[in-house]
Design a protein with these regions (language model features):
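Amphipathic alpha-helical segments used for helix-helix packing
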Residues: 91-113, 127-131, 157-164
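Short coil/turn segments at alpha/beta junctions that flank glycine-rich nucleotide-binding fingerprints
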Residues: 20-24, 95, 137
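Helix-turn-helix
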Residues: 9, 13, 17-51, 55
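Short, structured helix-loop boundary elements
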Residues: 7-8, 28, 50, 54, ...
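Amphipathic alpha-helical packing segments from all-alpha helical-bundle domains
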Residues: 62-65, 111-135, 145-149, 172-175, ...
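N-terminal intrinsically disordered/low-complexity leader segments
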Residues: 1-5, 141, 189-192
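Hydrophobic alpha-helical connector segments
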Residues: 55, 69-96, 148-151
């Protein structure tokens, strides 16, 4: 096995174990044993468990962050929100271990930590869409930061629940999220 292949093997094993047991519940010994190598091999590639975990988390953040570009591909607010909602749920469906690592010991509303920072970044992108939407409804666009966090939090928290429930189908969860958010937004009172 080449050095690059070994590194990827250790990343794959670490990702799975961190998702199952968390950072504290995973040991270098277990990672090395499952890879069929000695502990020094793990240290050689990553410097330790912290280094391996950091690379795993960075890759998941990068993977999820790259999906937020859909926010700017659709021409109108509702299609943008629909696309972003479906993308997040697809990420969860296709990368359950990675999402578990990101949300473990995290709160969707907290802006500290990797997951919270990622959600804050996404909410920042949603602010521009939300400001335009609020303006079109006669609302103060300065409320966009609050509304964007409401929207992102609603999707993120539902995504955490759906990660374990897996019912109803992804498309149905997305449709219901969009229905709740959009119909609620479409009825905003300009005076509130």
């Amino acid at each position: 096995m080449t050095g690059q292949e070994r590194r990827q093997q250790l990343l794959d094993i670490g990702r799975r174990l961190f998702a199952e047991r968390g950072f504290e519940g995973t040991s270098i010994e277990e990672i090395a044993a499952q890879a069929g190598v000695s502990k020094p091999v793990v240290y050689e590639h990553f410097g330790g468990k912290e280094g391996l975990y950091a690379v795993v988390v960075d890759r998941e953040v990068e993977r999820l962050s790259s999906m937020t570009t859909v926010l700017f591909e659709a021409p109108h607010s509702r299609p943008k929100f629909e696309a972003a909602t479906v993308q997040l749920l697809r990420y969860i469906e296709d990368n359950a271990d990675g999402f578990r690592i990101l949300v473990r010991d995290s709160s969707p509303g907290a802006e500290g930590g990797t997951y919270g920072t990622l959600l804050a970044d996404i909410a920042g992108q949603v602010e521009y869409i939300m400001a335009d939407f609020l303006k079109s409804r006669g609302r103060d666009p300065k409320l966009a930061p609050m509304y964007s966090r409401m929207m992102v939090g609603m999707v993120a928290f539902t995504g955490q629940w759906w990660l374990d429930a897996r019912k109803p189908r992804l498309e149905q969860v997305a449709a219901n999220l969009i229905d709740l958010a959009w119909n609620g937004l479409s009825q905003l009172d300009a005076q509130a």
